[in-house]
Amino acid sequence: MAKTDDFKAKTDDQLAEQLGELKREAFNLRFQAATGQLEKASRVKEVRRSIARIKTVQTERARSAAK
């Protein structure tokens, strides 16, 4: 699981790319959970929180750019 500082060090393009990857992974994990094939249930929580961290960094940057 990545820390917020790791996300802050990345560019906007890198964050957008990683956000897309995490969203795809979250979809796949939800699908696995629905079909009973999920091996690590904790990964769902990690991915969800990483998505939230990326969105938080993006919002912070958007607000600081608007000032």
UniProtKB/Swiss-Prot annotation:
One of its GO terms (molecular function) is structural constituent of ribosome. CDD domains: Ribosomal_L29_HIP (cd00427). GO terms for biological process: translation. SUPFAM superfamilies: Ribosomal protein L29 (L29p). Coiled coil: none annotated. One of its GO terms (cellular component) is cytosolic large ribosomal subunit. InterPro entries: Ribosomal_protein_uL29 (IPR050063), Ribosomal_uL29 (IPR001854), Ribosomal_uL29_sf (IPR036049). Gene3D superfamilies: 1.10.287.310. Keywords: Ribonucleoprotein, Ribosomal protein. Belongs to the universal ribosomal protein uL29 family. PANTHER family: 60S RIBOSOMAL PROTEIN L35/50S RIBOSOMAL PROTEIN L29, LARGE RIBOSOMAL SUBUNIT PROTEIN UL29C. This is Large ribosomal subunit protein uL29. It comes from Sphingopyxis alaskensis (strain DSM 13593 / LMG 18877 / RB2256).
